[in-house]
Amino acid sequence: MVQQAESSEAESNLPRDALDTEEGEFMACSPVALDESDPDWCKTASGHIKRPMNAFMVWSKIERRKIMEQSPDMHNAEISKRLGKRWKMLKDSEKIPFIREAERLRLKHMADYPDYKYRPRKKPKTDPAAKPSAGQSPDKSAAGAKAAKGPGKKCAKLKAPAGKAGAGKAAQPGDCGAGKAAKCVFLDDDDEEDDEDDELQLRPKPDADDDDDEPAHSHLLPPPAQQQPPQLLRRYSVAKVPASPTLSSAAESPEGASLYDEVRAGGRLYYSFKNITKQQPPPAPPALSPASSRCVSTSSSSGSSSGSGAEDADDLMFDLSLNFSQGAHSACEQPLGAGAAGNLSLSLVDKDLDSFSEGSLGSHFEFPDYCTPELSEMIAGDWLEANFSDLVFTY
């Protein structure tokens, strides 16, 4: 509407002969001028009703015809680019006649096609990967198909050995295509021997942090006489131990036939050791938390400083029972002395330690390097019965 008001003001300022010449050009190029009596002046051959031209279309139609007469070899896209730049450079007073003609065509369009509604064509969404272009050779398309199937084949190779081990075993979905640091982990642990072979075959080179952790705890391995079979030791190097087991998990976890159970926490797979009998020395833990390492140093220093073997065994048993019952953090903060030992009887400590070894709670507070012969005999003996009621504390 503002443009119409400006057009009326501009018409009064423009000379009349100029308006007559412009109107003559509009009428010459306008579809209405060709055949005003034709009701289908804005329809295509297929019956589609075209949109009414705006001011730019009216102007560009005239200018395009002039350019095509001067240079017929110029490309249509180049003509449109030049016309767009020239239209932006025009003054508002120069655009007014074309705006007026566009308004007249719009009103004519509304009168001839009252039920018209603009419905833009919906372009079909074509997938470029699904349909190769017509100009593309079949060799290139076949190569592209092979490249697309490459990652799928790699995943199938990784999953093939896992399918042999058992139906319940499968690789994690994020392992395929994750890079060299990907770890193939099993979800179930029904068959230990098959799991061990498959895991050692499928597991790529471990991360840098795993390599750094293993040499640091190599001194905690038991002597050759007490070492376990090489298969178990290989599985321990692969497994991860949870940082701090609790008493509730000890009471809830049933004692199964497998040596260790899998615990999934925070999206990462861990292993907790199970069914460690009293006659077998406990395995070396692959990873220790900072709090547990402080407890190791405290218990080792107290055990080495005492003179007699019986005192070493008593101190170590008290340290282990205190760490197990109250947690790593509280045990390291409390002073380990004879005054605190008076509150706990030796039989209760022995029962706690014995039930802890039989209950297979998966704790990492087990130090085979610091076990004295007296303590090993006490642990190996069957003179106490394990009772879980000793582990229950009422407040």
Swiss-Prot record:
Matches recorded under Gene3D superfamilies: High mobility group box domain
Instruction: Name residues in a coiled coil.
Output: none
User: Pfam families given for it?
Assistant: HMG_box
> Which regions are flagged for Polar residues bias?
1-11
Example GO molecular function term?
Answer: cis-regulatory region sequence-specific DNA binding
Protein's GO biological process: brain development; camera-type eye morphogenesis; closure of optic fissure; cornea development in camera-type eye; embryonic digestive tract morphogenesis; embryonic skeletal system morphogenesis; eyelid development in camera-type eye; glial cell development
Where are the compositionally biased (Low complexity) regions?
Answer: 158-174, 289-309
- Chain positions covered by the region annotation Required for transcriptional activation activity and synergistic coactivation of transcriptional activity with POU3F2: 363-395
CDD domains associated with the record = HMG-box_SoxC_SOX11 (cd22037)
Task: Say yes or no: keyword Transcription present.
Answer: yes
Mind listing the UniProt keywords for this protein, alphabetically?
Answer: Activator, Developmental protein, Differentiation, DNA-binding, Neurogenesis, Nucleus, Transcription, Transcription regulation
Protein's cellular compartments: Nucleus
Chain residue ranges for the region called Disordered: 1-22, 114-258, 276-312
Give any Gene Ontology cellular component.
Answer: nucleus
Q: Where does it primarily localize?
A: nucleus
Its job: Transcription factor that acts as a transcriptional activator. Binds cooperatively with POU3F2/BRN2 or POU3F1/OCT6 to gene promoters, which enhances transcriptional activation. Acts as a transcriptional activator of TEAD2 by binding to its gene promoter and first intron. Plays a redundant role with SOX4 and SOX12 in cell survival of developing tissues such as the neural tube, branchial arches and somites, thereby contributing to organogenesis.
Q: What is this protein called?
A: Transcription factor SOX-11
- Originating species: Rattus norvegicus (Rat)
